[in-house]
Amino acid sequence: MHTKHTLRTLAVVAAAGLALTACGTTSSSSTASSGSNCPSGLKIAFLGAQTGDYANLGINISNGANVALDDYNKANSDCKVTMQKFDSQGDPNQATKLATQIIQDKSIVGVVGPAFSGESGATGDAFNGAGLVTVSASATDPALTTHGWTTFHRVVATDADQAPQDAKYIKDTLNAKKVFVIDDSSEYGKGLADGVRKGLGNLVTGNDAVQQKQTDFSATVTKVTSSGADAVFYGGYYAEAGLLIKQLKAAGYKGAFMSGDGSLDPGFIQAAGADAANGAILTCPCAPSSADFTTKYKADNSGAEPGTYSAEGYDAANVILSGIAEGKYTRADLLDWVNNYDQDGLTKHIKFNKGDVSTVVIYAYKVGGGKIQPGTPIK
């Protein structure tokens, strides 16, 4: 099977359920990505957290990218690619230093990531200046595509898409009348919370800001319980969200609790405890993993279950790898490939409009029985 044909087949089959075994071989026929035409040592990079408080989200994405890489290498044995991981720990300053290393390594022709909005903003100028294409699975700050960068792309909807849907769910499904909105002061958390505030209008009964790595939320808990709120929205990440809901429930709060994709992780339940976490609503522009993808993911990642943005990690990597399969070996050629990408992915149809993906779906996941249950689209 010719390599070009193989990658087109992979993309179609992935969207249908990741039944990829039929595409696991290539012939020795000459193609754009075979033999001496393929440079040796081609690499893609992953940039995102692998350690630290928010490592789970980064690991989910890099593991998803591993599945795409495995599929690619099985189908393209004549032009194998490796992925080098760069651990930002979710820190924009660390990500900036790592971006310099990535740019200086000329064997790296594309980047899966950055994973977080803050580090995406911090590294955008550098990657754009180097002409090195990046495809993020999870950076949702709407402002990231307003800087004129031609290299930044994402395969997920933005907070500008998610926040109105979150507000709609709070009003129409939770039927809340008084909502207390809290954010973690991060670029991501405040941006999402501000969008929810706007969508809720006069239903907002109170606001507060906390900090990342904060563990004592007693002052905020007092404000919430004193406000008479029947719902709380939190913009931030799972470590603090779990502690916040735990302390709210301990103080007698009986209302609903909602947070966004930064909290959609088993770490939320671990921090909160199952009893406190049960009933929480966690929204995300990320699709639930299919059974077929879950099987492949576990096989490629030592039995680990796919998590938030794992499937999007697959899609982000596959956007880049499919270009390599078509003989796009230089940074310039891959950038052009991604800018004009228009194919079905695992999670959605992927086509970019100035870096933003065209297809937008927001899912609501509910915690029940001490687990995050499969999400359903917010209508």
Give the role of each language-model region:
Residues 245-314, 324, 368, 372-374:
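Extracellular/periplasmic periplasmic-binding protein-like sensory domains
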Residues 46, 102-115, 135-137, 178-183, ...:
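Periplasmic-binding protein-like
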Residues 24-27:
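Bacterial signal peptide processing site
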Residues 97, 142-143, 150-252, 288-292:
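Extracellular/periplasmic Venus flytrap/periplasmic-binding protein
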Residues 30-32, 59-61, 71-149, 212-217, ...:
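Beta-alpha junction/loop-to-helix N-cap segments that form part of ligand/metal-binding clefts
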